[in-house]
């Protein structure tokens, strides 16, 4: 789950959202190609899919749009921002006086909701440049409508906003927030999400692992079997639980309160993380993030984490 997705660093004009890693990728690809970049690779921009009255944010739209405006302002001060929206003129009115419009691009496109990390393209790199892998997003296992969100990546490529080889992977359900790459041949994911019967229920774990290894050219997949956040619609996306960092490091959510409903599951997750090994057979450096205090919104638990 996530409201934004990074767009890798451009190798051409800074005014284009061309997907190209430049020198960093060139050095990487001399060793291994193709590869699925890690989260910390250089990027040229960020995609936001903007909230509107037909999204699930309708009941608090003004408050949420204010939050998105703040996010857009911070992004556009630093890098290019792609805003996907069915109403670009309305969004321009909202942000024009606040956001650096020189760094903003718009894609007019119908959308169901705002979860760009999950419905956006997943980018592979090789010596010839970027490939934009377009998987099916089915509303986290058919929980929510997603037919419009599934058109965004194709429209962005057809309109020349995202430049790269478009790769149709719509025969497989996969969200960006459900996998984590270290950029060196290892994927981290969760069993609850990827083995959900409402995603790729016709495939078993072995078949899914073989498919992911083939598509992403990775050598190992680490499956977390435990861990969740109450109120999370994604079926335990890895990006809410554990993330790769440079130097064989994994940061993860830790719960030390034995009275918390998450305690047993997150303790089991932590134990499994200690059992994981790098491709060189070494244990990972594990850094625990404190579990944030509970926030209740209209009687329901609001999943969140602390970020420094």
For each feature predicted by the language model, list its residue ranges.
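N-terminal export leaders
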Residues: 1-2
């Amino acid at each position: 789950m996530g409201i934004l997705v990074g767009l890798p660093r451009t190798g051409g004009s800074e005014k284009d959202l061309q997907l190209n890693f430049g020198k960093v990728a060139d050095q990487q690809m001399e060793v291994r190609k193709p590869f699925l970049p890690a989260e910390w690779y250089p990027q040229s921009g960020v995609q936001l899919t903007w909230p509107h009255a037909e999204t699930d944010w309708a009941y608090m739209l003004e408050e949420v749009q204010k939050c998105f405006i703040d996010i857009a302002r911070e992004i556009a001060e630093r890098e290019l921002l792609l805003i996907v929206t069915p109403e670009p003129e309305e969004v321009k009115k909202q942000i024009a006086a606040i956001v650096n419009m020189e760094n903003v691009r718009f894609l007019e496109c119908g959308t169901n909701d705002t979860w760009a990390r999950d419905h956006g393209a997943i980018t592979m790199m090789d010596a010839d440049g970027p490939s934009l892998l377009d998987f099916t997003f089915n509303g986290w296992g058919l929980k929510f409508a997603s037919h419009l969100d599934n058109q965004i990546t194709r429209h962005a490529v057809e309109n020349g906003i995202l430049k790269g080889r478009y790769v149709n992977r719509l025969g497989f359900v996969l969200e960006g927030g459900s996998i984590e790459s270290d950029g060196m041949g290892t994927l981290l994911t969760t069993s609850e999400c990827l083995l959900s019967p409402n995603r790729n229920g016709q495939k078993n774990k072995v078949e899914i692992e073989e498919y992911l290894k083939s598509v992403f050219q990775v050598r190992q997949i680490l499956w977390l079997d435990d861990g969740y956040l109450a109120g999370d619609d994604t079926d335990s996306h890895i990006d809410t639980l554990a993330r790769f960092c440079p130097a064989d490091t994994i940061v993860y959510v830790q719960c030390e309160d034995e009275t918390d409903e998450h305690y047993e599951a997150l303790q089991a997750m932590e134990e499994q993380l200690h059992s994981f090994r790098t491709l060189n057979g070494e244990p990972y450096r594990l850094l625990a993030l404190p579990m944030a205090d509970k926030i209740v919104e209209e009687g329901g638990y609001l999943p969140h984490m602390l970020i420094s």
